[in-house]
């Protein structure tokens, strides 16, 4: 499977995607050919039968072939229209269920074309923000040393087990939040000195009111 030229956090700040990091809907970003999965949220990975994002995006896990065929058939309609729809049968709990999907063409910030696939709310579930945040960081296991969803004032909404090892002070964290708030592309990347060594970090501003960050 071909990799995107953009990293997960680079794609997370795309206008079409940033609202789906914390969402009750499954979201997938597929290549223009619909053969490659470029990005997904936690429920998007589950929709394709993957337990985590890293294996799916690195090509180590094979996405559900039947669902990919159905998405591909629906995506062929995008040559004549702006939107398309598909109904797929996915195993999201104890038994398979029908999930409605909407497909739209997207042009990414780097000029690449892609197809965004978004489900209706997953089998009627209503997530609390804490649940969505925890699902997001758990899905990112293996992408880096640590991850977290951070609120407007630097509060940690959810974090991976290793995030505490970064030992970031409130002042340091709020300084980074102030920096990213000034960036038009909603993203900063820095080297951070931590007790476990110098680590490259990325901070993405996902939402503004209230502010939410990855």
Indicate residue ranges for each PLM-predicted region.
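PAS/PAS-like sensory domain loop/N-cap motif
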Residues: 34-35, 147, 154
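Sensory/regulatory domains in signal-transduction proteins
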Residues: 25, 30-135, 162-214
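Short, charged amphipathic alpha-helical "coupling" segments at sensory-output junctions
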Residues: 1-19, 118-136
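PAS/LOV-family sensory domains
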Residues: 19-21, 140-141
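Amphipathic, soluble alpha/beta structural segments
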Residues: 151-153, 161
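Structured alpha/beta or helical-core interaction and ligand-binding surfaces enriched in interleaved
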Residues: 157
